[in-house]
């Protein structure tokens, strides 16, 4: 076994599994984010987001920017939710939240819908988990 593989194996073994309450809280935050958009419920979306949210999508090189990013603030996402941009009848919902990693204070989560994939970094603030960073990409239509 290579040294790098051994280090990864040891670090994975040293990380205790998150308890059921932590997993449920992280999943609830992910569902507040996506279900709030699908319901057009801006308050539900807002409670899932850090005030200094960094939501970005990779654009690549543009005429105005090398390594371009589409940037979105918490306020912009809440405004789009209020407008009902993703409002969808509940019987058509198709979304999944998959927790990739959890530490005492952070979590990495993958959200997938038919329209987009989000990769979240969540932070634990007291007993609340909220989305601090989101890197997303649209799915081909």
Give the location of each predicted region:
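Short beta-strand edge/turn micro-motifs at domain boundaries
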Residues: 108-110, 115-141
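Short, low-complexity N-terminal intrinsically disordered segments enriched in polar/charged residues
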Residues: 10-43, 47, 51, 67
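Ligand-binding grooves and catalytic loops that recognize ribose/phosphate and carbohydrate rings
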Residues: 24, 73, 137-141
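Tryptophan-centered short beta-strand motifs
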Residues: 65, 69, 129-132
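Solvent-exposed strand-loop boundary residues in beta-sheet-rich modules
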Residues: 59-61, 126
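Surface-exposed, charged secondary-structure patches
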Residues: 54-59, 67-116
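Sec-dependent signal peptide recognition
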Residues: 1-7
């Amino acid at each position: 076994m290579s040294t790098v593989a051994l280090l990864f194996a040891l670090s994975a073994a040293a990380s205790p599994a998150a308890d059921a309450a932590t997993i449920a809280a992280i999943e609830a935050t992910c569902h507040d984010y996506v279900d709030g958009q699908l319901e057009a419920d801006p308050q539900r979306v807002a409670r899932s987001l850090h005030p200094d949210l960094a939501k970005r999508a990779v654009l690549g090189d543009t005429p105005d920017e090398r390594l371009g990013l589409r940037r979105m603030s918490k306020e912009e996402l809440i405004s789009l939710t209020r407008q009902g941009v993703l409002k969808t009848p509940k019987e058509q919902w198709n979304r999944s939240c998959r927790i990739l990693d959890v530490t005492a204070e952070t979590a990495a989560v993958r959200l997938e819908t038919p329209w987009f994939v989000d990769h979240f970094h969540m932070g634990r603030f007291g007993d609340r988990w909220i989305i601090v960073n989101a890197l997303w990409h649209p799915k081909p239509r």
